[in-house]
Amino acid sequence: MATPHINAKDGAFAETVLMPGDPLRAQLIAETFLEGAELVTNVRNVFGYTGTYKGKRLSVMAHGMGIPSASIYTTELIKDYGVKNIIRIGSCGAVTPDIKLRELFVAMGASTDSKVNRMRFNDHDYAAIADYTLLRTVVDTAAEQGKKVTVGNVFSADLFYGVQPNMLDVLSKLQVNVIEMELAGIYSVAAQYGARAVGILTVSDIIPTGEATSAEERQTSFRDMMEVALDAAIKL
């Protein structure tokens, strides 16, 4: 049945859903890679599609920007539509220049400046981590495709603008490699409701140097990330 934010019918989603932030990237993935892709939800222009990839039924749906938006969509997919596996595919900014532009990054753990996980966890710190089986599947799939990935930790920031002074130094010292805006929420939602989640990201910015990809490139390219995510998804 429909939820406040998803108007799909029961059974409309596959057990595994790839989730970019951008609805247009979801549309691109569905139209480029999925056979028989059907638009199953479009509330607020947040598109969700279901089709098949190499014979396996898969879905792709956008989650928007930030932990609150991503948490809404992942919660409803898991609780109301029976989704078992979430693979976030998105972009991130590298904290240090040793991680290169367009490199693939798999998020093992997610720190955050958001309070949402403390609210879930009786005001204590929660270790938001990827499901190991999904993480290993993504890493192995990348290796099979001959694609280099870095596995490490992300910082899920509430603010896109306004990073605290010296924050990059703190993150680097504590081995937090990249910044994004959703995974600390997605990982905790998946754990709370008994699902599994992992994030595979493409480095779109090198924060200390100012190197960056264009908005168009972030929407329409990053094909390596998509191929790894799709080929990992059909193994689940």
From Swiss-Prot:
It catalyses: a purine D-ribonucleoside + phosphate = a purine nucleobase + alpha-D-ribose 1-phosphate; a purine 2'-deoxy-D-ribonucleoside + phosphate = a purine nucleobase + 2-deoxy-alpha-D-ribose 1-phosphate. A purine D-ribonucleoside binds at residues 5, 180-182, 204-205. Keywords: Glycosyltransferase, Transferase. One of its GO terms (biological process) is purine nucleoside catabolic process. It comes from the Bacteria. Phosphate binds at residues 21, 25, 44, 88-91. Its EC number is 2.4.2.1. The active site is at residue 205. It is an enzyme of class 2 (transferase). The record marks 218 as: Important for catalytic activity. One of its GO terms (cellular component) is cytosol. The keyword Glycosyltransferase applies. GO terms for molecular function: purine-nucleoside phosphorylase activity. Belongs to the PNP/UDP phosphorylase family. Homohexamer; trimer of homodimers. Catalyzes the reversible phosphorolytic breakdown of the N-glycosidic bond in the beta-(deoxy)ribonucleoside molecules, with the formation of the corresponding free purine bases and pentose-1-phosphate. This is Purine nucleoside phosphorylase DeoD-type. The lineage of its organism: Bacteria, Pseudomonadati, Pseudomonadota, Betaproteobacteria, Neisseriales.
